[in-house]
From Swiss-Prot:
MF (Gene Ontology): pyridoxal phosphate binding; threonine synthase activity
Cofactors: pyridoxal 5'-phosphate
Stored Pfam families: PALP
Pathway: Amino-acid biosynthesis; L-threonine biosynthesis; L-threonine from L-aspartate: step 5/5
Documented EC number(s): 4.2.3.1
Protein name (Swiss-Prot/TrEMBL): Threonine synthase
GO CC field: cytoplasm
Broadest EC class assigned to this enzyme: lyase
Protein's gene: thrC
């Protein structure tokens, strides 16, 4: 097991605390896949409790006693029959990551990231966040007894997420700027070795997130979807999920790979614009804006990995408007009973748009990833809903309303 630069190929020991290569390239974790292949099988995996740590051989942990867990993973994969009829498609699933302990997919990364911090003997961890990362890191820091500092863009974080980070006991700092400004600041703290950085620039955190791919295959009885649609903000998740599918293929668990499709908000779509030009590099947005706060990121750190995932898989990238996001959020709630935050609904909005554009075949088996629970941002849901009806204690009025249902 080692760290390898995706740009120049230089390798580093796994115990070296480094976030990017000397050349500036992003790092990824590489394993002895032949050794994993000898150790795992579908049958062996199935005998273990479902969750992130079911797939231990694929995770960068040397000492199991150092694992920090809140029973993350094992999230439901819903067959969405009502949405299939609504959208006119054959087979649709939603992988609901809002069912994780702190309500988002970030918990998968943090269980591995904070475990790694444990192995390294780190005492102080930190991150910049649009909300979910801070909530998750704060929870896992509390679980492990570590000190935690999180930087958030002032006034740009949904209250549900802010409340979590504060209540778990992290030192919460609000920065007068955007997410990218906050990230620059924590990266400097990490450079000066004042914190162990657990944003998705840290390759160990992404190792936990790749287990989404493992679970999808597991829950589909080792079948592979034709396409996986992922909301894209800092771009770590789509990269991690693609890596998970590839590692299952390398080790003989599956023999096909899905098309990875990334969805960004129209006000923060540097990866989509790069994809349209078939470019390898993005042009950052200086002032990203969208109702989907979790993906309101103008300069995604993992853009090179995300674009590689999209290009290598024959996938696609598309942007959706705030109006399309809200419509999809309502559609998912009212047709399937799944309540997600706005950023999560971008995967459904993107599916709908790409079906209308003829990019996605209606016979495909599709999995949409929803990344966070609706209670993360209840204000957005309330703003998008009708006002509750107010009445006196009058049964006649109540029955009249009942007839109008």
């Amino acid at each position: 097991m080692l760290q390898r630069c995706i740009k120049c190929g230089k390798t580093y020991d796994v115990d070296e605390i480094i976030y990017t290569c000397e050349c500036g390239g992003l790092l990824e974790i590489i394993y002895d896949y032949e050794e994993i292949k000898d150790k795992v099988s579908e049958e062996k995996l199935r005998k273990r409790e479902i969750g992130v740590w079911r797939y231990l051989e694929y995770l960068p942990v040397k000492d199991e006693s150092k694992i920090v867990s809140l029973c993350e993973g094992g999230t439901p994969l819903y067959r969405c029959n009502n949405l299939e009829k609504e959208l006119g498609i054959k087979e649709l699933y939603v992988k609901n990551e809002g069912a994780n302990p702190t309500g988002s997919f970030k918990d998968r990364g943090m269980t591995v990231g904070v475990t790694r911090a444990n192995e390294l003997g780190v005492e102080v961890v930190g991150c910049a966040s649009t909300g979910n990362t801070s909530a998750s890191l704060a929870a896992y820091s509390a679980r492990s007894g570590k000190k935690c500092i999180v930087l958030l863009p002032e006034g740009k974080v949904a209250l549900g997420k802010l409340a979590q980070a504060m209540f778990y006991g992290a030192k919460v700092i609000q920065v007068k700027g955007n997410f990218d400004d906050a990230l620059d600041m924590v990266k400097q703290l990490a450079k000066e070795k004042l914190i162990y950085l657990l944003n998705s620039i840290n390759p160990f955190r992404l190792e936990g997130q790749k287990t989404i791919a493992f679970e999808i295959c597991d829950q589909l009885n080792w079948q592979v979807p034709d396409r996986v649609i992922v909301p894209v903000g800092n771009a770590g998740n789509i990269s991690a999920i693609w890596k998970g599918f590839k590692e299952f293929e390398i080790t003989g668990i599956i023999d096909e790979l899905p098309k990875m499709t990334g969805i960004q908000a129209d006000g923060a779509k540097p990866i989509v614009e790069a994809f349209r030009k078939r470019a390898k590099d993005i042009i950052p947005y200086k002032n990203p804006e969208t109702i989907a706060t979790a993906i309101r990121i103008g300069n995604p750190v993992n853009a090179p990995k995300a674009l590689d995932a999209i290009y290598s898989s024959g996938g696609y990238a598309e942007a959706v408007t705030d109006e399309e996001i809200v419509e999809a959020q309502k559609l998912l709630a009212r047709k399937e009973g799944i309540f997600v935050e706005p950023a999560s609904a971008s995967s459904i909005a993107g599916l709908k748009k790409l079906l209308e554009e003829g990019i996605i075949d209606r016979d495909e088996r599709i999995v949409c990833i929803t990344t966070g629970h609706g209670l993360k941002d209840p204000d957005a849901a309330i703003r998008a809903s009708e006002e509750p009806i107010k009445i006196e204690c009058d049964m006649n009025v109540l029955k009249r309303i009942l007839k109008e249902l």
